[in-house]
A protein has these predicted regions:
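Short, low-complexity disordered leader/linker segments with a strong preference
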Residues: 1-60, 172, 397-408, 574
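Detector for C-terminal structural segments
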Residues: 35, 45-48, 90, 237-241, ...
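N-terminal lobe/hinge region of extracytoplasmic solute-binding protein
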Residues: 46-48, 64-120, 128, 149-152, ...
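Surface-exposed binding/hinge segments that line
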Residues: 57-59, 117, 122, 126, ...
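Alpha-helical secondary-structure segments
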Residues: 65, 142-150, 178-184, 188, ...
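Gly/Pro-rich hinge or "lid" segments in bacterial periplasmic/extracellular proteins
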Residues: 102, 197-255, 259, 381-386, ...
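Aromatic- and charge-enriched surface segment that lines or borders ligand/interaction sites
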Residues: 114-160, 182, 271-274, 324-325, ...
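Ligand-site clamp/hinge motif
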Residues: 131, 222, 247-293, 308, ...
């Protein structure tokens, strides 16, 4: 996938959702070859009808069922509309490969290319000689044209991509034969290993509008499935799920499984019960206290690792947000009014471990460069109340859970919409706690729990239509992915925040090749942004992966590459 942040909201580790355009393919669609004689040649409902209900029967057929917490409405995760975690882990990572893969130890491993080399002036990729596309049963080679096409689409101003970072430093290319491409830099790009994380098939997409491709399939311009990974998307049906089938032309290790079915289960509690009851063989759920019931169950493996998941509450600065949020003292008051440590204890319970409030928005606690810049705004309701008294009227005289008074500030009531995705038990609990905590200091929260396709659709978070929005970013190890999120005019900057000094520092980091100097630039930027409080970092969310103990080969990956990074290794225990 591309080096960008992926949105995680809603009922799970998920998703930036947008409805398919009028010109997109129908929602229920088969992208398998007509010659496929299996039920998977039809939409998912028919495919699912042939999947055995008993795990032992699935094992006999080498079929695995994975619980999928969120639907998707597009597989082109490079677009602003479609930065969906579940789209990436189902339709990108196991299907369309990139220069590097990232393993469970967060190491970059050569994947589509045999070698990659960056200098101050060039970036050279030598493509694996055996790398080929599966296109509706036909075999076509992966060539330099695919890398060139990918770069051209990502820098084309007509395309609504979420990030051009790094790609916009490339000025042109040459090639040596079909399997080597040499890009030239305008300036070197520090995080170059995360470029070309997904390479598009140029021949299969010829003549297509990049903004509209892959709305309901991962396919070529003829609707036939396309893949250079271990699997291809055989079918997808909105609201139901999708099926992956083995790509016979995959250059890597031959998968042991013949089929992986992703069954959409949008309620987190229902998902847990599906795992307990054997309806699904594995889940990658939203981390929450409800998962405790799966620990210690015979026959279930429960794996939990520190994740690169930034759980946060975005604050809207733009015209669609409440005007009071543009005042730094209000944002500071809100953050000091939220007891993040208490929330962690409540929503995670015995699973919390050493999870603590996150006080940085470019680094995670395990990073050596992490500094507790936002710690100055830790829970302090008395100080928060004093700030509100200084700027507002009509609020409470003391902090009290029974308070019913709301401040009025500069003619506006201290009343804000709080948006999160419905059906998520963890975030619903989180919102209820925050609502009560802020009520005790005279700030009123109105509930805006909505379906994911509304929250992350064209009129939701990407449009800036919220006051406070609770979701998460899932990232790669390098902080470069945060640059288009926090910088002025950044393509991922849905909150419309701008600190020009912080932006200049982050932009400078993009071409600084010395790791220590680069870290200092990010540290300085974070310190400046901490003064502004553009967002409220909550915590670095742990990442769980839970599967039947009779399934072998699953390894949790804490980054946005996700759990399908090694799907070809999955197999049933013999």
């Amino acid at each position: 996938m591309h080096k960008r942040l992926l949105l995680l909201g809603g009922v799970a580790v998920t998703v930036l959702m947008i409805a398919a355009s009028a010109t997109a393919r129908p929602a229920a669609i088969s992208t398998a070859r007509a010659s496929d004689a299996t039920p998977a040649a039809a939409p998912f409902a028919q495919s699912w009808a042939s999947v055995p209900h008993a795990a032992a029967a699935r094992q006999a057929k080498s079929i695995l069922v994975f619980g999928m917490e969120q639907d998707i409405t597009g597989f082109n995760t490079a677009l602003t509309c479609c930065g969906a975690y579940w789209a990436a882990v189902t339709g990108n990572v196991p299907v369309v490969r990139g220069a590097y893969n990232i393993d469970d130890k967060l190491r970059h491993v050569l994947d589509l290319v045999a070698s990659a080399k960056a200098t101050k002036t060039t970036l050279t990729y030598t493509i694996r000689p055996d790398a080929s596309w599966y296109w509706g049963g036909k075999k076509t080679p992966v060539t330099y044209k695919d890398f060139a096409y990918t770069w051209q689409q990502l820098v084309d101003p007509r395309n609504d991509v979420a990030s051009r970072s790094g790609y916009d430093q490339i000025t042109g290319f040459t090639h040596k034969g079909a399997k080597q491409i040499v890009f030239t830099w305008k300036e070197p790009y520090a995080d170059w290993p995360d470029l070309f994380g997904l390479v598009y098939p140029s021949q299969a997409l010829a003549g297509q509008d990049f903004n509209k491709i892959w709305a309901n399939c991962v396919c070529g311009n003829d609707g036939e499935p396309i893949s250079d990974g271990p699997f291809y998307v055989s079918n997808y049906t909105k609201g139901q799920g999708l099926t992956l089938k083995v790509n016979p032309f995959w250059y890597g290790k031959k998968p042991s499984l013949k089929e992986v079915d992703f069954k959409i289960i949008t309620d987190t509690n229902t998902e847990v019960q599906a795992m307990r009851g054997g309806e699904v063989d594995a889940i990658n759920p939203t981390f929450g206290v409800n998962l405790a019931q799966l620990k210690g169950i015979n026959g279930i493996t429960f794996n939990q690792v520190p994740g690169l998941y930034q759980e946060h509450i975005d604050i809207q600065f733009g015209p669609k947000g409440q005007p009071l949020l543009r005042a730094p003292w209000m944002r500071q008051a809100i953050m000091m009014g939220i007891d993040r440590a208490a929330i962690i204890k409540t929503v995670y319970g015995s699973l919390a471990g050493n999870t603590s409030p996150l006080n940085n928005i470019v680094y995670y606690p395990a990073d050596a460069a992490y500094k507790s810049d936002f710690g100055k705004w830790n829970f302090n309701p008395a100080k928060s109340l004093a700030l509100l008294k200084k700027h507002c009227t009509g609020g409470p005289s003391a902090v009290s859970q029974s308070n019913s008074d709301t401040w009025t500030c500069a003619g506006y009531p201290a009343k804000f919409r709080y948006t999160w995705t419905a059906s998520n038990a963890t975030r619903t609990t989180q919102e209820a706690i925050i609502k009560q905590q802020l009520k005790s200091i005279g700030i009123e929260i109105t509930d805006a729990a909505l379906p994911a396709n509304v929250v992350f659709g064209p009129t939701g978070v990407p449009s800036g239509n919220y006051d406070l929005a609770n979701f998460a970013w899932v990232t790669l190890p390098d902080p470069a992915g945060f640059v288009p999120t926090w910088s002025c005019g950044g393509l991922n900057n849905y909150l419309n925040y701008c600190n020009r000094k912080a932006t200049a520092l982050m932009n400078a980091s993009q071409t600084e090749l010395d790791p220590a100097k680069r870290a200092r630039l990010f540290q300085q930027a974070d310190a400046l942004m901490a003064n502004d409080v553009p967002t409220i970092p909550m915590y670095a969310r742990p990442n769980p992966l839970i599967w039947k103990s009779t399934v072998l080969g699953m390894k949790n990956n804490p980054s946005q590459v996700g759990f399908t990074w090694n799907v070809e290794d999955w197999k049933w225990k013999s």
